[in-house]
Amino acid sequence: MTVDAPELLEKLRITDAGANGADMSSSTSAAANGTGKEVDDGSDDDGTENPPAVAAEHSTAKKKKNKKRKPKKKQPKVQTDPPSIPLSQLFPNNSYPKGEEVEYKDENRYRTTSEEKRHLDNLNSDFLSDYRQAAEAHRQVRQWAQRNIKPGQTLLEIANGIEESARCLVGHDGLTEGDSLIAGMGFPTGLNIDNIVAHYSPNAGCKTVLAQNNVLKVDIGIHVGGRIVDSAFTMAFDPMYDNLLAAVKDATNTGVREAGIDVRVGELGGYIQEAMESYECEIRGKTYPIKAIRNLCGHTILPYSIHGTKNVPFVKSNDMTKMEEGDVFAIETFGSTGSGRYVEGGEVSHYALRGDADRKDLTLSSARSLLTAIKKNFSTIPFCRRYLDRIGQEKYLLGLNYLVKSGIVEDYPPLNEKPGTYTAQFEHTILLRPTVKEVISRGDDY
């Protein structure tokens, strides 16, 4: 719509030199240029023909109008402590930080400059954006956890703090049906002390308190759109455990460094074992060789499924399976001052719906309703009892055990080394992109 500002101004001067005319001339002039500012009518008139009262009233109107304008709310630029601002506000263009990019070696070196491979890489923009958002959430949450986890805290306090922040950063609290499938926890936060190797997360009512002489493994999974970032670290508060942690960190970094397209996983396990078992650790005057836990493996990650079909052993093996373009691997290692083997046992906290389960008729009504809730809120993403509590499930244990016995839900008991031993874990998620290997979870901390 076009407005002839000079003509309007002339009419206003003729009909009314009062406040209404001045106010209307201001507003219509602003409308004419679309900016909210007055326009020049092209005359040599300096405005002296307008009575002073009109000019004063016009000025007052402008001031009043300006007072009504509320300044735009600025987006926060700095994360809070603990982290609570969604990453979408810190990275408004969804341009999340890349992980560590590493060029392939030897016969795959050409991939870095191949136009064909670059094109394939560009087709994965949504995939990479989801993974990088989950990875940035992981870095911010875990670095806060590393600064704040202290002896004297309960495992429940630690787990709830980590998970609350993770959900805030991805912008989905998981309290409405299906919300946690958009983004949220990739699996229950593992808080495994001393000889407990993996798969322990505190259930409601857990009273365990972290002690000064404990070795704590913190395993966190965060997903966006089903793209799970799986990364873990170990904390100890007594320097006598330093060599144990150093051995496992070195082994994980070795696995990350040697992994790549066409690498055979059995050979990769040999590199990991060699790095791990070159260390020993003196604890209370006794020296222990660090052993790789040989009946555990790293693994591929699939959408909405933390364990894929390929494994990466921690020891040399004859497994000729090759890593391939497009694979996503969790390269993790566990070291121990004990036998180097785990056994299952203890109170179960981790569960997951089996993707291949036969959906047989369930005679127990509580099992049927629980299964519906699991499907709608978690699908095949692992969950724990605390997560069922959060979505309002009550008196579900009988139904949950029934689903486990029916083979529809898998339970994952804690994995334990011998009592009195100590274990450590470090883990990264890597993407075998067409052009480069991206260590998506890499951070300044590890």
Swiss-Prot record:
Binding site for substrate: 199, 307
Biased amino acid composition, Basic and acidic residues: 98-116
Cofactor note: Binds 2 divalent metal cations per subunit. Has a high-affinity and a low affinity metal-binding site. The true nature of the physiological cofactor is under debate. The enzyme is active with cobalt, zinc, manganese or divalent iron ions. Most likely, methionine aminopeptidases function as mononuclear Fe(2+)-metalloproteases under physiological conditions, and the catalytically relevant metal-binding site has been assigned to the histidine-containing high-affinity site.
Residue stretches of biased makeup (Polar residues): 86-96
GO molecular function: aminopeptidase activity; initiator methionyl aminopeptidase activity; metal ion binding; metalloaminopeptidase activity; metalloexopeptidase activity
A single GO BP: proteolysis
Gene3D superfamilies assigned: Creatinase/methionine aminopeptidase superfamily, Winged helix-like DNA-binding domain superfamily/Winged helix DNA-binding domain
Swiss-Prot/TrEMBL catalytic activity: Release of N-terminal amino acids, preferentially methionine, from peptides and arylamides
Family: Belongs to the peptidase M24A family. Methionine aminopeptidase eukaryotic type 2 subfamily.
Protein known as: Methionine aminopeptidase 2-1
Gene: af410
